[in-house]
UniProtKB/Swiss-Prot annotation:
Compartments, record wording: Cytoplasm
Main location: cytoplasm
Alphabetic keyword roster: Carbohydrate metabolism, Cytoplasm, Lyase, Schiff base
CC per GO annotation: cytoplasm
Cytoplasm as UniProt keyword: yes
Pathway recorded for this protein: Amino-sugar metabolism; N-acetylneuraminate degradation
Protein species of origin: Xenopus laevis (African clawed frog)
Quaternary data: Homotetramer.
Enzyme class name: lyase
UniProt name for this protein: N-acetylneuraminate lyase B
EC number: 4.1.3.3
UniProt cross-references to InterPro entries, sorted A to Z: Aldolase_TIM, DapA-like
Length: 266
């Protein structure tokens, strides 16, 4: 049975982790960062400590401190703070999940272990169930990013297995170019939120019914992507295509600079 409650939709910025010149996390600028996203980019949802936030390269302590600051400063200004809690070890993931719940996060998400990988889909479901159980009151989203994890199971098949096994399961952050798999998820599992994570081809995912999108570029291209969403929803596909193409031209330059460092420089 799907987790009941509010649905995630629209643009969700995958936040960068601010750093000092000494490579320490810079908590002092997070309030300003939140205000910038809300006031300048019209973003009201964030995904923290994920790939863009370099969460897998941070210590557990650093991730907890970041979660606390993001939740504190987003309260009353944003609609949702989704905290990525995935780690290479199950106990750390559960620790972060419980901590996110205690801080007042709105949802959690997790990639699966990518060093010693789940042997099959059933093993992956058991892992996700264990992580989600540490924060049973929070909606849980699986973070699918096969380019980095090497986990290439079809998400369409995964959703069929989690449906009756993880009560708090709410959907998937789908960061892959396989639009056939994505489309099947959207059409067959309407109770779940299917959030697309490849910014440069968002329009294609919208055509297949994406409920929302999570991405790094919404930190600085939130308004432009918002315009594209509005054009698409209004049925003005020509305008939506024009905006998507202009975004792609810009992102081609940004990604050529080295994806995350280039984006962070913006």
């Amino acid at each position: 049975m799907a987790f009941t409650g509010k649905r995630l939709k629209g643009l969700i910025a995958a936040t960068f982790t601010p750093m000092t010149p000494n490579s320490d996390i810079n908590l002092l600028v997070i309030e300003q960062y939140v205000d910038y996203l809300v006031q300048k980019q019209h973003i009201r949802n964030i995904f923290v400590n994920g790939t863009t936030g370099e969460g897998m390269s941070l210590s557990i302590c650093e991730r907890k401190r970041l979660t606390e600051e993001w939740v504190k400063h987003a309260r009353g200004k944003m609609d949702n703070v989704i905290v990525h809690v995935g780690c290479l070890g199950l106990s750390d993931s559960k620790d972060l999940a419980a901590h996110a719940a205690s801080c007042g996060a709105d949802a959690i998400s997790a990639v699966c272990p990518s060093f010693l990988k789940p042997a099959n889909l059933d093993a992956l479901v058991l892992y996700l169930k264990d992580v989600a159980s540490a924060a049973p009151s929070l909606p849980f989203y699986y973070y699918h990013i096969p380019k980095l994890t090497g986990i290439t199971y079809q998400i369409y098949e995964l959703l069929g297995k989690v449906k009756e096994n993880i009560p708090s399961f709410r959907g998937v952050k789908f960061s892959d170019v396989n639009l056939m798999d994505f489309s099947l998820c959207v059409s067959e599992y309407k109770e779940f939120d299917c959030l697309y994570g490849v910014d440069e081809q968002l329009l294609g995912a919208l055509a297949f019914g994406a409920h929302g999108a999570v991405g790094s570029t919404y930190n600085y291209l939130g308004n432009k992507n918002g315009d594209m969403l509005e054009a698409f929803e209004a049925g003005n596909l020509q305008k939506a295509r024009k905006i998507q193409c202009s975004l792609q031209e810009f992102l081609y330059f940004v990604f050529d600079m080295a994806h995350f460092s280039g984006s962070k420089a913006n």
